[in-house]
Amino acid sequence: MDAGVRSTVKFRTTSIALIFGIAVCATFSLAAQKKPAATPVPVVFAQDKGRLTIKLGGQTVGHEEFEIAPSGGGWLAKGVAEIKPPDGGSSKVSGSLTLQPDGAPISYDWSAQAEKTNGAHILFANGVASITLQMQGARPFQQDLTFNTPLIAVLDNNLYHQYAVLARIYDWSKRGVQSFPVIIPQELTPGTITVQSTGSASADGKTYEGLKVTTSDLEILLLLDGNHRLMRLEVPDAKVSVIRD
């Protein structure tokens, strides 16, 4: 499979009001005192669902169906991509990422079907990603990757909706350059990315909000609508374009 399609990244992060202290006054009346409510965890996500067309050198090589939705007390971002490059065999990859409302990952499962079927389950806790990898015909392999923060970006091969998740994790109130640790699960690769708002950007006669993602060897441009939904993704050096249908 062409390297540009195989991976766009190669190197590879209730409010409970406390009522306490019942005070007894001289006449034995009771008064409940209430502490200020704890600051609620911010919710950075919005429900989204769509289909992406994946192009390499202007030629369609695959599609991805995805959905980002509330799940329990958190959020679930899941997608399935089918890739068939002109000079290689077809493959199918799926990913399911469970997240805290603030964007920190809780767990991730992926499965890739090509000549063999491989997959993994990852649990995130206290900045540690505990990975159990299952390769067809091999014993399960376990590995831990340690990060210095629980807010880790998960950007897996050929699952471009995960850049929509990244666009939500980016702090738009601060803007500027923001760095995130990142994990590429199918490659067991950790690394660091920087994300920066580029302001207004245009493509095919349409205007978007631009967000630039920089890795050690690639620049990825995310084009978002006014609600920061991913509409288009461009990787110029790899000649990859991903366009929402």
Protein language model features and the residues they cover:
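Short, exposed beta-strand-loop hairpins at the edges of beta-sheets
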Residues: V213-T214, I220-D237
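N-terminal mature ectodomain segment of secretory-pathway/periplasmic proteins
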Residues: K55-M135, H228, L233
